[in-house]
Curated annotation (Swiss-Prot):
It comes from Acropora millepora. This is Uncharacterized skeletal organic matrix protein 5. It is found in: Secreted. One of its GO terms (cellular component) is extracellular region. It comes from the Eukaryota. Residues 1-21 form the signal peptide. Component of the acid-insoluble organic matrix of the aragonitic skeleton (at protein level).
Amino acid sequence: MGAARFLVQVAIFLLVKPARSAPAPMWKGNSTARKSCSQASINNCSCRCELSPASTTANAVSALEDKIDQVIALANRTTPRHSAPVASISSCKEQFDKNNSSPSQVYELTFGSQVVPVYCHMGNFGCGNGGWTLAMKMDGTKTTFHYDSLVWSAQSSYNPAAGKTGFDMLETKLPTYWSTPFDKVCLGMRLGQQLNFVVLNMTANSLFSLIADGLYRATSLGRNTWKSLIGAQASLQRNSIEKGSTPGLVVIGMPG
């Protein structure tokens, strides 16, 4: 799209003295510069004549025209170009579907009238190729997201600033927890410097709808799959598998 153009209008006001009786106009300089009269007397003047090209007034008008052209050119160069508005998205998957080479970074997701900056994990980092929307990050050494915490049943954010960073131990819960529908959930756990991931094939309107009521919901993952997430040397209690919960997991996101 070309640069925006502006029509610059310049109004020049001249203070004209009242007309008074005066002798016929006298021409100075070379008589050849004077134009001959071509029309009848107008406004008490004996003739209408064009400005002499060499006159001071003609030079001033020409200089003014040049200055106006310069102002218009400057306005056209310095005026910012206006691009078409970018369509809003409500998940990282939407961004990935539009451009599958989109990098992993913060994108603005829109939920109704609320715009939330969310870190999107793009590509295949361990859960399959796609755009993964961050929902939560938890630190298992803290009690913020303990299994009986009220955080799970509240439709309110927790430390949303940490939703703008990637794989770290900054805890967060974002509006995506109760606003984003999905058909897969990617769970990740950091063990020292190692990151392990598993994928839950589950369909729901949101994580909130699955978790907030506290009811049991079976998963398709077996004991060995869960152990691959927390490390081969770790152990799991049987009731942890039955309840489908393991404290300390980091919920990375959903591709829905």
